[in-house]
Amino acid sequence: MKITVKDCSLERAKIKKAKIKTMSTKLKVTVIASSLAILLFTIVGGFVNVRASSNDGAYRQLSVYSEVLSRIRLEYVEEPNIAGVTDGALHGLLESLDANSSYLSPEEYKHYKTMKTGGKADIGATVSKRFGYAAVVAVIPGGPADKAGVENSDIIESIEGKSTHDISLAEVHALLSGEVGSTVTVAVVRPRRAEPQKIVIARNIVAIPPVGEKMLADNVGYLQVDAFPEGESQEIAGKIRDLQKQGAKKIVLDLRNSASGAESEGVATANLFLDHGTITYLQGQKYPRQAFNADPSKDITKLPVAVLVNRGTAGPAEIVAAAILENARGDIIGDKTFGDGSVQKLIEMPDNSALILSIAKYYSPSGKAIQDAAVTPNVLVADSTEEEAGLPDEDEQAAPSEKPGDKKDEKPKNVQDDQLNKALEVLKNRESKG
């Protein structure tokens, strides 16, 4: 075959064009990888501010990441979506720190801001992550989620068809909030059932129920606290005074399924029972220790107290329980709590993405991070109401559930409250011992 000069020139042009295209792709990958490496090191080395030796370790990890990215680019079965790979890496990086830390892409951050400023209505439930999915820690009694049939410990498999496994907790919260009267559809999973069930929830401004108060037998005053909004500690103080006027000689403080509110209200509530000692303290790597100590002038009762907790006890309620337990002020009865107590910082990035980063944790008086260790009662008693309702154990893998709306019909009536009964027994024994 005869090859002319013109043919050779054309062939060389094609080869040159192909090389340029290849170089362009490599350059694009290199730029993305470099950008991600810089961002990763900023997070690992800058925000965390580790020592030089640790920085060397961070550099080594970035080298490994660069090698992995190179292998993906060169050997993956098809040309990869590098932007998707890096986005997934950033989400995974932040979410591997703790449930409350999140990476929001520019699009996600825009949506997050819109939902946060678009309305204060939500579903009336505290939601965290479990098994990698969004999970209901506790619902507010009488709130939208409760009325729709959502239950404590439900796994939210998806929101509006979007898997919660694929999004950050911040995005979950954004999706669940919105305008008053708007609806959101969630698919929930419960144990020992066939399939996830869809529940439609009408968002609303959630009113926290008032503190429950009543007198029980043997001069026991009973208080039920569903959440810790601003001013809750003052309401609790008033209820304690009312119970004492009614002749209460002992107090049961029920914090089961109390999972939301302001940590400051938890501190103030604990102080009602303590005249000395540390209630809690905040601390982070770059967050100086901030101790919250009991103020003797704010202690209003010396009555024996027993605190009820379960897996739905989180946040401010855990601060109260840990303070009373570790200052030997009273007994904690029930299940191990959820474990949630930290402070987050929103950090906007140059590309309009954002990080939500945990910068400090709340610690019990003895130095246990509440978010990591939770609060273990000194008197462990399984929640008989949850066992009767068929809710999963802490380590039990969830499975799909019954149809929504069946909650009120299927929930057992007159369930014996083993935890409350044990609290009454503990208080009686303490009284007999003088």
For the regions a language model picked out, list residue spans one by one.
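Cleft-lining beta-strand/loop regions that shape enzyme active-site pockets
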Residues: 47-61, 65-82, 135-138, 144-152, ...
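Active-site/binding-pocket entry motifs
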Residues: 109, 207, 229, 279, ...
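Low-complexity, intrinsically disordered tandem-repeat tracts enriched in small/polar residues
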Residues: 1, 13-20
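Conserved functional hotspot residues or short segments at active or partner-binding sites
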Residues: 354, 361-434
